[in-house]
Regions:
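Terminal low-complexity segments of carbohydrate-biosynthetic enzymes
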Residues: 126, 130-136, 140-151, 164-182, ...
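N-proximal low-complexity "stem/linker" segments adjacent to membrane-targeting elements
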Residues: 1-24
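Short aromatic/hydrophobic "clamp" motif used to bind/position activated sugar donors
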Residues: 81
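A short, conserved alpha-helix in the catalytic core of glycosyltransferases
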Residues: 98, 188, 194-195, 200-206, ...
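A conserved acidic beta->alpha catalytic loop
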Residues: 30-31, 37-48
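Conserved donor NDP-sugar-binding/catalytic core segment of glycosyltransferases
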Residues: 89, 93-163
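Short, acidic, metal-binding catalytic loop of nucleotide-sugar glycosyltransferases
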Residues: 23-33
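Glycine-rich, basic loop-to-helix element that forms the pyrophosphate-binding segment
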Residues: 60-75
Length: 311
């Protein structure tokens, strides 16, 4: 089927929680929403259950996360597209709640919580949280995963920024400001595991520019392009999603795409050159405008802002 409201785009490579993520989406959508998942060079295990609102594309050779997201978007006919990671859970009716307050020049995300996906459990009786690793500290044997799949209590994130590198940062101080209060608040940047905008804006702004590489700086790219083109990046506090944060492969859930300092640094250098040097051709505002709007910001000084203005 082809949804009219939202196409949820999921680029995935060897993601063990993809099927669970899709099941969670299907169980919680209330608008005319579909899932378009791209299996980027790897079949998923466990397999994805068939559902009329789920479309799966298999690529025998990996093309990268940004390219896979773009491929999924080309298959959409919905008004909105929402990119999400393949290891997330969602609030009931999250899609309808996001649409209700949406504006066509916004990029929006709901409150982000931490996903408690599983615990490690050993036959000797020891159990611990997902980030502690699969080796039992009591008997030394390999532990098994026990699914939990619930948002962690007390984990709610509403505001994000980036420093002069640029490197992603949480912006908790902003939530204490008057402009950081309310059901709908602005955010300088995004974490990148989920965001929604119109499909027209996705293509107009080249939201997933493949020249950035497969991975890295996506939240910065999406947020800065939205702000500098005249739009707004908003957080909707009326709903939430929960994201499972990866640690290391030896802990049982590493990164599915090859991770190298060169790749991540390359994306940062691309972002810095494109936005800090005001080279993005769709910008109607300089980056200094965005920084000044949210100052004070962790990782920025008044001197940094002045230097940015003088570039």
């Amino acid at each position: 089927m082809s949804a009219k409201d939202i196409s949820i785009l999921i680029p995935a490579r060897n993601e063990e929680f993809l099927a669970r993520t899709i099941e969670d989406i299907v169980n919680n959508i209330e608008a005319d929403t579909e899932v378009i998942a791209v299996l980027d060079g790897e079949w998923t295990n466990p397999p994805i259950a068939q559902h009329p609102r789920v479309n799966v594309v298999y690529l025998p050779v990996s093309i990268g996360q940004r390219a896979a997201t773009n491929l999924a978007c080309r298959l959409s006919k919905a008004k909105y597209v929402m990119k999400v990671d393949a290891h997330c859970s969602f609030d009931k009716g999250f899609d309808a709640k996001l649409i209700a307050d949406m504006k066509d020049d916004w990029t929006v995300v709901s409150t982000m919580r931490n996903l408690h996906a599983f615990d490690w459990v050993c036959k000797c009786g020891l159990s611990h949280y997902q980030d502690k690793g699969e080796t039992c500290t009591q008997c030394g044997k390999k532990m098994e995963k026990k699914m939990i799949w619930e948002p962690r209590r007390g984990t709610r994130n509403y505001s994000y920024c980036f420093d002069t590198e640029p490197h992603f940062q949480y912006f908790r101080a902003f939530s204490e400001r008057p402009e950081g209060k309310g059901d709908l608040t602005e955010t300088m940047s995004l974490q990148g595991s989920a965001f929604m905008l119109t499909r027209d804006k996705y293509w107009e702004l080249d939201i997933c520019d493949e020249s950035f590489g497969s991975w890295g700086s996506q939240g910065i790219e999406v947020a800065v392009k939205t702000w500098l083109s005249g739009g707004k990046v908003m957080v909707n506090h009326k709903t939430w999603y929960a994201h499972m944060f990866r640690t290391k492969s030896q802990n049982g859930f590493g990164f599915p795409y090859p991770q190298s300092g060169k790749q991540v640094d390359g994306a940062k250098k691309k972002a810095r050159d494109l936005f800090f040097n005001n080279k993005w051709d769709k910008a109607i505002r300089p980056l200094s405008w965005l920084v000044e709007k949210f100052m004070p910001i962790p990782g920025w000084t008044e001197k940094d802002l002045l230097e940015l203005k003088n570039l």
